[in-house]
């Protein structure tokens, strides 16, 4: 029997720094599909991306400031305690073991990440442990480069919210979330040039960035 009352999701990323483009779409998503909790999980050594500019401790502090008044979010630092790359499949398998076999669990990604998903380490095991919730990105198609990958997507894709609650894992749900044209790269560039980005991230996070002399 599936526990239908507590759909939870992990939201991973570098968060260098965390900004409204991270937080607002997920808050809207939670209301749309009935997420009870979103676990923010900062990466330590992202296998596919350059090293973060802020330290792990600084990124964690910024996240704590950003979600201090947002009960939807909690923070999980397990990947920061590893000395190895942050493999999503490993983390999600651990999470499933902790939560038991019946609880509906999900992993939130962007549509851009879905297109490269088959290149992820042990990607084929991920849907054994969680659902995938895909947030739309402008300009990205819903077609995979390889025919076999397209068949995999078509087999698991659903537009039925209830399927996220009625089974513990195994579906890919395409969410209708709004797009916020904000990125950590843009914020870092604007800060480096001494330009304002107050509308892009929480005030407490921006104050901390200035106190620490980050991204300048």
Curated annotation (Swiss-Prot):
Gene Ontology biological-process entries: NAD biosynthetic process
Record has Nucleotidyltransferase as a keyword: yes
Pathway terms, separated by semicolons: Cofactor biosynthesis; NAD(+) biosynthesis; deamido-NAD(+) from nicotinate D-ribonucleotide: step 1/1
Gene3D superfamilies: HUPs
EC number, UniProt record: 2.7.7.18
Any GO MF annotation of the entry: nicotinate-nucleotide adenylyltransferase activity
Catalytic activity field: nicotinate beta-D-ribonucleotide + ATP + H(+) = deamido-NAD(+) + diphosphate
Keywords annotated in UniProt: ATP-binding, NAD, Nucleotide-binding, Nucleotidyltransferase, Pyridine nucleotide biosynthesis, Transferase
Record-linked InterPro entries: Cyt_trans-like, NadD/NMNAT, Rossmann-like_a/b/a_fold
SUPFAM superfamilies membership: Nucleotidylyl transferase
Top-level taxonomic group: Bacteria
Enzyme class: transferase
Any single Pfam family the record assigns to this protein: CTP_transf_like
Family of this protein: Belongs to the NadD family.
Protein function: Catalyzes the reversible adenylation of nicotinate mononucleotide (NaMN) to nicotinic acid adenine dinucleotide (NaAD).
Name of the protein in its database record: Probable nicotinate-nucleotide adenylyltransferase
Originating species: Klebsiella pneumoniae subsp. pneumoniae (strain ATCC 700721 / MGH 78578)
Gene label: nadD
């Amino acid at each position: 029997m599936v526990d239908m009352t507590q759909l939870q999701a992990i939201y991973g990323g570098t968060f260098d720094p965390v900004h409204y483009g991270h937080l607002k779409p997920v808050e809207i998503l939670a209301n749309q599909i009935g997420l009870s909790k979103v676990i923010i999980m900062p990466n330590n050594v992202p296998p596919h991306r350059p090293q973060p500019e802020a330290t792990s401790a600084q990124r964690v502090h910024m996240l704590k400031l950003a979600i201090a008044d947002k009960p939807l979010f909690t923070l999980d630092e397990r990947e920061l305690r590893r000395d190895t790359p942050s493999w999503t499949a490993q983390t999600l398998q651990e999470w499933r073991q902790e939560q038991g076999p019946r609880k509906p669990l999900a992993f939130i990604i962007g549509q851009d990440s879905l297109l490269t998903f088959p290149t992820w380490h042990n990607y084929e095991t991920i849907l054994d442990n969680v659902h995938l919730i895909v947030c739309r990105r402008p300009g990205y198609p819903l077609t995979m480069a390889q025919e076999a990958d397209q068949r995999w997507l078509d087999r698991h894709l659903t537009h039925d919210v209830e399927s996220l609650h009625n089974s513990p894992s195994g579906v890919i749900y395409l969410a209708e979330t709004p797009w916020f044209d904000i990125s950590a790269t843009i914020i870092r560039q604007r800060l480096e040039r001494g330009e304002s980005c107050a509308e892009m991230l929480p005030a407490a996070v921006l104050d901390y960035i200035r106190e620490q002399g980050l991204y300048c």
